[in-house]
C-alpha cells in the first residue's frame, strides 16, 4: 500500500477493473430482490456540470448500498439526445446535428466513467438512435389506431426564435423554456396525444404514490385541475346560436351581467356585428401575440372589446353584452365565461374598466353590499339575494339546488371539468423523431405501414439558419407515394416533442436489445416499476406527468403490467455558488473536470453528498472540498498506520475486550446502525458521512493500537469504516479493502451488520436539574436504580453547592435520562 493517497492512480485502476469485469452488468434474477434505480438522463450538451455530479452521485450511493445489501440492482444511463440545441450548433458550426450530438455523448460518457458511477453501460441508449425511435413510431401508430393520437387545428404557443411549438408546460413566465424568448400565439395543424382520456386516473393515482414528495403531487393535481360545476347555455339575441359556459359558481348566475369570450373562441367573429368587426379583428391579432401564461397573471392588465352582440341570461332574461377578454383562455372550460363582477375579481376589474353593470347576489353575514361602493369583488360564502327562489339560502348550499333547477329547465347540466389539455407534440424542426404519417390529397392522413418503418431522418438536410423546418426542404424525404392509392403524396415533416422520447425510455432500459418490439413484457415485468427515480423538481408537470400517461397507455396496449412508472421519487436541490444557481452567464460555474483532476472523483462525490441533504440546495464551498479531501487522506493514513498491527486478526471476542476496546466496538456498531438507517430509510447522506467521520476520530484516539489483544477490534473498526464509505467513495474504499488483504472487492463483501448487544451502553449519563435548571451531569451504571442516581447526584461537586443549606422537597426521576431536584 502506498503511503500517500494519489486519487488519479487509485481511480484509474478501479475504473479499468470495473469495466473489464463488467462489474455492474445485470440480468433478471428471480432469486434476488430487484431494485431499479434511475436518475433522469441528461441532454448531451457537451459537458456535465456540478448539478449532474450531485444528481448522479446521489443515485450511485443508493445503487451501491443496495448491491451491498443483496439486491439485484439495475442502474442504467443514456441520452435524451433530440432537440433544438443540436440544430443551432449545426447552423453555428456547419456540422450535422448527429455529429455534434454523438461527439458530445462520447465526451460526457467519459466524464461519467471518471466519476466512478456504477452504471450498466451495456444498456446505454440514445433517443436519436434509429433503433430507439423506430419503436416510438410503432407505438405512435398503435396509439393512433386506439384514438389516443389525433390532428387538429389549434392556437399554439409559438417561439419565434426556435421557430417551433411549445407545450403550455414549456412556457415559463411568458418565455420559451429553452431560449427565454417571448412566446406568441399561432394557429397551426398539430398532432396531439389524448392525455385527457386518462385525466381521472392520473389524478386518482396521485393518492397511491406515498414515495413521492407531496409538493410534486400537489403540482400535478393542480395541473390536472378537476372541478365540479355546470355547463349553461346562454341564447344569443336575434340568433339561433347559444354560447355554452362552464362554471363552478352557478350560485352567482343571477349576478351574471355580461359575457366574456376568449379571443380564439370559434364564435368570436360569428357573433361580431359588421360595424364592430375591424376593431374586434385588431384585438384578436393583438392577443394572439401575447403568451397565455401572461394573460392569466393577476397583475396583467385586463383588456377587451365589445362584439356588438348580446346573450340572454337564462334565469333573469337580462341582456348581457358579449365581450372578448384577453384573460379568458380557450383551453379552459368552454372558452366562454359568464361574468359576475360583484363576485369575481377579474370580472370586477373588467367591469370597472368598461363601465359594465354590477348586481350583488351574495351578501356577507351582517352586512349589505352596495355595488356602487364596492372596491373589490366579494368571493366568500354568504346569503343569496336577488336570486329568485333561492333568496335566503346559504350560497354553498344553493349551488346544488341551482344545478338541479338548471337541469329541470333544460338550460344546463352538471359537469366535471379538467384543466388538463391534450398534449400537443408537433414540433417544426429536423432533429426529432419523424411523425410516421403521409398526407394524401385523396386519402387524407395515411399511417406509414409497418413494413415501411422506421421513417429515418435524412442525413442531407441543410441547416442555413433561414428559419422554418429544414426537414420540409428535403424533397427526397417529403415527396412520396401514398401507400393506399398510389397517388403522389407528402410525408409529414413535423417531428415529435422530445418529451415523447423521455416518456418511455425507462421501459426500454429493461430490454435495450429486444428486437421484436419496443418492450419485452417479461423483462419489463421483472424490473418495473422504477424503485427510485431521481431528478429535478422542474419536471413535476412535464416529464413526470407525461411518463405517467405513457405508462398507462402502454399498459392498455398490452406492453406493460404496471400503472405507474416510478414507485419513489427524490427531487434533489440545486447547486448554488455565490448565492445563485451555477450558470455561465453568472460566471460562477465550477468545472467538474478541473475538480476531479485536482482532488479526484471521490472528493467531488463526498463533498456534494456531505454538504447538504439531497432535497436541499447545496451551497458550494471551496473550503468544503478541501475538507473532504483532507478527510479521505486521514482515512488513507489511518489504514496505512494500523496495517502493521492488525495483521490477520480475527473477529473480536466481546468477553475478552478491555474497557477501551469495548467502547470502540460499541462506537463501531452504533455507527453501522446509524449509517444503515440513514441510507435505507431517509437518504440522509450528510448525517451518515458525519457518523463515519466520528468513528474515524474514535479509532484515531484509540490506544494502544499496537497491543495484540486490540488487533481484532481495531481490524473490525477499520474494515467497517471502509465498508460504510464504499457507496460514497468507491475508489478509495476498493483500494483500502484490497490493502486490508481482501479479494473480490468491498462491494462484494456485503454491507456490515451491527450486533445489537454491542450497541448497549454500560453506563448512562444522567442530566441533573435543581428547580428545573441544569446544574450537572452524573454517570451511573446502566442498571442503576433511582436511589443510586440520587446518591450520585447529591455527591456531585457541581450539584452540591445548589443543595447546601436547602431543604430537599422532592426528586423527580425520569429513568435513564433526567433527575430534577426540587429544593426550598
From Swiss-Prot:
Belongs to the class-I aminoacyl-tRNA synthetase family. This is Leucine--tRNA ligase. It holds the Pfam family Anticodon_1. The gene is leuS. It catalyses: tRNA(Leu) + L-leucine + ATP = L-leucyl-tRNA(Leu) + AMP + diphosphate. It is an enzyme of class 6 (ligase). ATP binds at residue 584. Keywords: Aminoacyl-tRNA synthetase, ATP-binding, Cytoplasm, Ligase, Nucleotide-binding, Protein biosynthesis. A motif ('HIGH' region) lies at residues 42-52. One of its GO terms (cellular component) is cytosol.
Amino acid at each position: 500500500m502506498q503511503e500517500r493517497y494519489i486519487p488519479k492512480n487509485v481511480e484509474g485502476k478501479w475504473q479499468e477493473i470495473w469495466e473489464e469485469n463488467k462489474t455492474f452488468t445485470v440480468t433478471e434474477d428471480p432469486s434476488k430482490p430487484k431494485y431499479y434505480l434511475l436518475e433522469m438522463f441528461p441532454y448531451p450538451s457537451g459537458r456535465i456540470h456540478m448539478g449532474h455530479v450531485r444528481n448522479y452521485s446521489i443515485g450511485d450511493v443508493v445503487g451501491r448500498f443496495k448491491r451491498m445489501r443483496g439486491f439485484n440492482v439495475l442502474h442504467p444511463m443514456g441520452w435524451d439526445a433530440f432537440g433544438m440545441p443540436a440544430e443551432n450548433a449545426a447552423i453555428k458550426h456547419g456540422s450535422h446535428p448527429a455529429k455534434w450530438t454523438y461527439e458530445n455523448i462520447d465526451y460526457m460518457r467519459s466524464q461519467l466513467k471518471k466519476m466512478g458511477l456504477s452504471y450498466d453501460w451495456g444498456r446505454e441508449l440514445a433517443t436519436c438512435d434509429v433503433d430507439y425511435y423506430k419503436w416510438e413510431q410503432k407505438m405512435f401508430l398503435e396509439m393512433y389506431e386506439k384514438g389516443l393520437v389525433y390532428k387538429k387545428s389549434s392556437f399554439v404557443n409559438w417561439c419565434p426564435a426556435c421557430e417551433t411549438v411549445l407545450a403550455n408546460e414549456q412556457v415559463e413566465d411568458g418565455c420559451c423554456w429553452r431560449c427565454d424568448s417571448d412566446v406568441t400565439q399561432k394557429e397551426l395543424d398539430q398532432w396531439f396525444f389524448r392525455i385527457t382520456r386518462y385525466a381521472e386516473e392520473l389524478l386518482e393515482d396521485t393518492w397511491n404514490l406515498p414515495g413521492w414528495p407531496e409538493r410534486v403531487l400537489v403540482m400535478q393535481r393542480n395541473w390536472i385541475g378537476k372541478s365540479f360545476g355546470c355547463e349553461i347555455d346562454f341564447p344569443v339575441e336575434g340568433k339561433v346560436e347559444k354560447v355554452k359556459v362552464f362554471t363552478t359558481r352557478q350560485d352567482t348566475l343571477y349576478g351574471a351581467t355580461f359575457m366574456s369570450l376568449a379571443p380564439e373562441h370559434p364564435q368570436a367573429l360569428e357573433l361580431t356585428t359588421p360595424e364592430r368587426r375591424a376593431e374586434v379583428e385588431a384585438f384578436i391579432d393583438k392577443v394572439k401575440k401575447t403568451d397565455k401564461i401572461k394573460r392569466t397573471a393577476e397583475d396583467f392588465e385586463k383588456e377587451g372589446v365589445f362584439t356588438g352582440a348580446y346573450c340572454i341570461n337564462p334565469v333573469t332574461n337580462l341582456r348581457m353584452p358579449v365581450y372578448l377578454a384577453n384573460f379568458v383562455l380557450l383551453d379552459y372550460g368552454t372558452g366562454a365565461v359568464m361574468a359576475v363582477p360583484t363576485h369575481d375579481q377579474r370580472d370586477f376589474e373588467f367591469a370597472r374598466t368598461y363601465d359594465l353593470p354590477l348586481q350583488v347576489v351574495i351578501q356577507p353575514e351582517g352586512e349589505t353590499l352596495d355595488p356602487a361602493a364596492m372596491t373589490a369583488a366579494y368571493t366568500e360564502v354568504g346569503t343569496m339575494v336577488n336570486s329568485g327562489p333561492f333568496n335566503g339560502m346559504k350560497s354553498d348550499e344553493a349551488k346544488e339546488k341551482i344545478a338541479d333547477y338548471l337541469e329541470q329547465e333544460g338550460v344546463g347540466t352538471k359537469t366535471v371539468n379538467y384543466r388538463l389539455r391534450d398534449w400537443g407534440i408537433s414540433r417544426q424542426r429536423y432533429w426529432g423523431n419523424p411523425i410516421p404519417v403521409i398526407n394524401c390529397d385523396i386519402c387524407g392522413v395515411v399511417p406509414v405501414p409497418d413494413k415501411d418503418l422506421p421513417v429515418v431522418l435524412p442525413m442531407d438536410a441543410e441547416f442555413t439558419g433561414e428559419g422554418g423546418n429544414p426537414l420540409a426542404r428535403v424533397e427526397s424525404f417529403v415527396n412520396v407515394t401514398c401507400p393506399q392509392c398510389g397517388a403522389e403524396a407528402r410525408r409529414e415533416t413535423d417531428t415529435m416533442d422530445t418529451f415523447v422520447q423521455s416518456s418511455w425510455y425507462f421501459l426500454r432500459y429493461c430490454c435495450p436489445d429486444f428486437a421484436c418490439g419496443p418492450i419485452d413484457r417479461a423483462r419489463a415485468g421483472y424490473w418495473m416499476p422504477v424503485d427510485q427515480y431521481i431528478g429535478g423538481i422542474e419536471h413535476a408537470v412535464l416529464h413526470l406527468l407525461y411518463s405517467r400517461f405513457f405508462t398507462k397507455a402502454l399498459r392498455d396496449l398490452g406492453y406493460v403490467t404496471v400503472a405507474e412508472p416510478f414507485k419513489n421519487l427524490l427531487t434533489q436541490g440545486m447547486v448554488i455558488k455565490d448565492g445563485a444557481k451555477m450558470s455561465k452567464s453568472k460566471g460562477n460555474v465550477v468545472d467538474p473536470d478541473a475538480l476531479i483532476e485536482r482532488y479526484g472523483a471521490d472528493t467531488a462525490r463526498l463533498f456534494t453528498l456531505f454538504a447538504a441533504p439531497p432535497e436541499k440546495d447545496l451551497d458550494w464551498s471551496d473550503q468544503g472540498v478541501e475538507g473532504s479531501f483532507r478527510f479521505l487522506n486521514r482515512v488513507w493514513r489511518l489504514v496505512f498506520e494500523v496495517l502493521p498491527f492488525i495483521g490477520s486478526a480475527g473477529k473480536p471476542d466481546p468477553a475478552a475486550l478491555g474497557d477501551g476496546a469495548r467502547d470502540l466496538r460499541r462506537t463501531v456498531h452504533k455507527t453501522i446502525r446509524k449509517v444503515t438507517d440513514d441510507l435505507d430509510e431517509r437518504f440522509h447522506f450528510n448525517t451518515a458521512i458525519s457518523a463515519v467521520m466520528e468513528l474515524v476520530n474514535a479509532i484515531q484516539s484509540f490506544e494502544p493500537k499496537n497491543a495484540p489483544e486490540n488487533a481484532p477490534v481495531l481490524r473490525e473498526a477499520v474494515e467497517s469504516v471502509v465498508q460504510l464509505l464504499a457507496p460514497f467513495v468507491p475508489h478509495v474504499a476498493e483500494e483500502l479493502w484490497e490493502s486490508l488483504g481482501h479479494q473480490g472487492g468491498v462491494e462484494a463483501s456485503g454491507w456490515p451488520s451491527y450486533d445489537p448487544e454491542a450497541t448497549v451502553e454500560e453506563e448512562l449519563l444522567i442530566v441533573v436539574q435543581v428547580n428545573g435548571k441544569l446544574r450537572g451531569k452524573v454517570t451511573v451504571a446502566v442498571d442503576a436504580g433511582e436511589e443510586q442516581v440520587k446518591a450520585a447526584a447529591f455527591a456531585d461537586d457541581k450539584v452540591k453547592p445548589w443543595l447546601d443549606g436547602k431543604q430537599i422537597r422532592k426528586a423527580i426521576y425520569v429513568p435513564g435520562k433526567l433527575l430534577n431536584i426540587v429544593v426550598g
